[in-house]
Amino acid sequence: VEAIVEAVNGEYKFVEVSGPFGDKVKARFGVIRGNTAVLEMAESSGLNLVKRENLNPYKANTYGVGEMLKAILDMGIRDIYIGLGGSATNDGGAGMLSSLGVKFYNLNGERIGYTPEELKNIVKVDISGLDPRISEAQITVLSDVSNPLYGINGASYIYGPQKGATPQDVKILDKILENYGNIIDNTVGKNFSEKPGSGAAGGLGYALMSVC
């Protein structure tokens, strides 16, 4: 973000959003020429915000990323660049989607939360409540990884261990993301979960590709 913002004499903005575990953090993003925003998902959901002994891939989430996007949309900005990397999360971007109005349901038709701990019970997703301003925005994802959402080269297997996942956790988290991805793919009518980069930032790349 710094390199881009400073190269074009942009400015920094700060917004209070939810951290990886719901605690409030002050997240920074850049604004260029008044109509373009540049942000790093790690500002709200990064490993840098969590002590190693507190890492928990079942609870860490990207809700704050959605709050950052809403703050940017509130400013009237529709050209957005988002950097993916250094995340403490493995929620497939469900936190961000929930913040933007997407709902998840279990087999009993009850609404459930957006952490991997709760997503293990997902059978349905409702994207009809997605913030309509998202469709007006041009969101460009900046990522240097090509991992798919799930599988042995996916988000959980490759990056889960650095987020606190044990070998057993990795298998569980991978199954959660596989089911989650299949449900969203079926809902939107296209397979995004196997696309290169969908596994970036614990699957946040997938949520941005498939729904946003």
State the predicted function of each range.
Residues 1-84, 88-212:
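N-terminal loops that bind phosphate or other acidic moieties
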